[in-house]
């Protein structure tokens, strides 16, 4: 699992598992972020080696993982992802909160306040140095803009970098399929649940809706 760039993730990510060996679900939640460090996380920024945290892009502030562009003059397609690698998960329920804040550094409208969680993600150790996004299925976060140039303003959309996704028996016709969510403004925490059943079913839930 990886987290793509350009957002602030609040305090912790919690995850509940179904045992890979048993059909009995676990009610125990596991914190993926300790609120103090990036222990257990691996950074990959396009054009740089694994764990080269170029310009201190990923930092911990106020018990949150912050994606910071304070030291950037231009973006130059330096897409970044941060991967949780302590354990692999197959059947799980992921909970997190995110928000967008601050000014935007990118020029492309498609990328404006654009982030997400990359599910079924490619191993960061197998990603090419200049590769911008891991092969994955993305639960995409967008924020704070009613009239985007690409026409999509909802959050928790489904995007498919390098993958084909079957929705109700049909391969998704577009790279990104929009959700039915409302538009969430910047500087507002948004609660997200993503429920994954092996390689077959993914549920996206926003603010328990």
Pin down the residues of each PLM region.
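Serine residues within intrinsically disordered or low-complexity segments
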Residues: 2-4, 26
């Amino acid at each position: 699992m990886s987290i793509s760039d350009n957002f602030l993730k609040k305090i912790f990510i919690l995850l509940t598992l179904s045992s890979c060996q048993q059909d009995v679900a676990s009610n125990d939640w596991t914190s993926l972020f300790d609120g103090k460090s990036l222990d257990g996380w691996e950074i990959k920024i396009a054009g740089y080696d694994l764990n080269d945290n170029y310009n201190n892009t990923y930092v911990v502030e106020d018990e949150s993982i912050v994606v910071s562009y304070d030291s950037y003059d231009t973006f130059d397609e330096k897409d970044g992802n941060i991967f949780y690698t302590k354990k692999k998960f197959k059947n799980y329920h992921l909970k997190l909160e995110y928000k967008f804040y601050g000014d935007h550094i990118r020029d492309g409208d498609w990328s404006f306040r654009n982030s997400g969680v990359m599910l079924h993600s490619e191993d960061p150790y197998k990603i090419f140095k200049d590769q911008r996004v891991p092969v994955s299925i993305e639960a995409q976060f967008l924020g704070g803009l009613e009239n985007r140039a690409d026409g999509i303003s909802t959050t928790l959309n489904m995007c498919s970098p390098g993958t084909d996704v079957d929705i109700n028996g049909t391969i998704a016709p577009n790279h990104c399929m929009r959700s039915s969510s409302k538009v969430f403004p910047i500087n507002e925490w948004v609660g997200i649940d993503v429920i994954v059943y092996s390689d077959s079913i993914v549920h996206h839930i926003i603010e328990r809706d």
